Structure formats: C-alpha cells, structure tokens
Amino acid sequence: MNPSVRIAAIQARPVSDLFDDMWNGGDVARAVTLLEDAARAGAACVCFPELYPRVGEAEICAAARRLGVFVVAGLIEGTRARWYNTATVIGPDGRILARQPKCFPTQGEIDNGVVAGKGYRVVETDIGRLGIVICADFAFFSDGPEALVEQGVDIIFNPSWWFALGEAYPATVIGRHMQYGKPVIGVDIAACSLRLRDADGRLVERFPRAGGYSTVCVPPPIASLAELAEWFRTKPGGTNSAQGFIQSLGEDEGILYADVDVAAVRRFPGYFYRTTSP
C-alpha cells in the first residue's frame, strides 16, 4: 500500500439545466474530461457527486482503465420507472468493484421511482478500505457511517446533491468527521438549477440554483491524545483554526485534492476520546 493516497473530490456542474439531458448522457463527456484533469494532478482515486454523471458506465470504466485510477461515480441502476440511486466503485483496471445504493431515499426520490437499497459494506482495495454513504443517508442517519466504521473503513466518501442549504453542507461533513475520526470526502454537485417538464410538457424550474461547498476532512497524523494536544498547540493557523485539516470549495465547479496517509488514519485515536465509537 502506498504511504499516501491522493483523493480528488470533483464538484461537477451539469452541462445542461434540463433533467432529461442527464438521463440521456449529456454529462458523460464532461465527466471524462474532469477525470483526466484529476489524473493529471496525481489523483489515485476520484469521486463524483451523487447522481453524476448518472449514465455512461462503459465510458467511465474505460476512462478509469486508461488513466489507471479508482473512480466513485453516480451511475444509476434500473429504469427511469424504478431505479436505485447508486454510487459505483470502479478499479484502475476498469472493472466494477462494488455498487453502493442509497438506503434512505427522500420522499421526492421515492415519488420518482427510486428504490431503497439495503446495507453498507466496505470495499477492500490496495489503497485502503473504502466506504460510501450517499447524500441524505449521511446527513440524517447514522446507520451508514456506523456500519462502515465497524467494518474498519479507512476513507468515507459522501457523494451528494444538495438541492437547498448548500452553505450548510460543510458542517455536516465536519461533524461526521469529528464524530468518527475518519477521513470524509464530501462531494456535492456544483451550484446549479434544473428544469423538468410538467404534465402539459412545459419546462419549469423544479430545483432553483443550489449546491456546492464540497468539503474534505482528514485527521492529523497523530497516534495518541497527548500528540493530539501538541498538534492543537502547534498546528498552522493556531489552536482555534481549522486550517490544515478542513478544505472546502465555493459554489462553482472545481476539484479538491486531499493526500491521505492510510497508515496514519489507522493509528488515529479520535478527537478527545480514546475511541471513535459513537
């Protein structure tokens, strides 16, 4: 296992504000371009937002293989009438390693055909044990993070699409990171609006502009509470600053990078307590 793994959180913006265009593959080419950008910057693992690019499994798998990177992509399973909101884990050889469905779809999703998945499982890879908890599963329920922590997860990915209150997203990511002491890669969609067709075929703005503020939190490389106290005293920005272990984007499209030392993560004792158990 490499001593440090570079993770890329891609805060992508849909190329069209028409919901139908996403279903028809309108974002696939842009997703591949963003993957290429992240790989050029040295990323070994790349995560897209929830439901992005939605379709294009063959193209994303081919890009992962060509670039030699792990990818977490929002690729749905099923038909438009009945489908799973799924994050698909793709290996650097282009093979699908796992599919993690959303287990607590919102009422709006259920009304539009989304089926609830069951359970969370860690994905064993040569860059560490990866886990995924999608959007509201992470923000409103503890089942996912707790299940992954019990399985020895090293890095938790939270692909999301916040249709409102995007400015609050970092607080959710930071809170879960502090609670469980694991790196959290929070990847929201870039701020955008989406239009749908109503019953009369007219285009209406279904979701006003919202999103952004992707946030990445990585624990400090310490192995005891005494070392944690010393880290607080000497860290960049001072004791009261989040500088050095919390990164966030604004509303626009962009990529956050985090270098994660998995061995150090496994030694981290948690914040203020000797265990990270809830």
Write out the residue ranges for each language-model feature.
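C-terminal beta-strand edge segments of enzyme domains
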Residues: 122, 190-278
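Active-site beta-loop-alpha substructure in enzyme catalytic cores
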Residues: 28-31, 35-47, 113-189
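Conserved hydrophobic/aromatic beta-strand scaffold that supports enzyme active sites
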Residues: 9, 87-89, 99, 120-122, ...
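Cys-nucleophile CN-hydrolase/nitrilase-fold catalytic domain and related Cys-dependent amidase chemistry
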Residues: 19-102, 108, 162-183
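Short, ordered coil/turn segments that flank beta-strands lining enzyme active or ligand-binding pockets
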Residues: 92-93, 126, 219
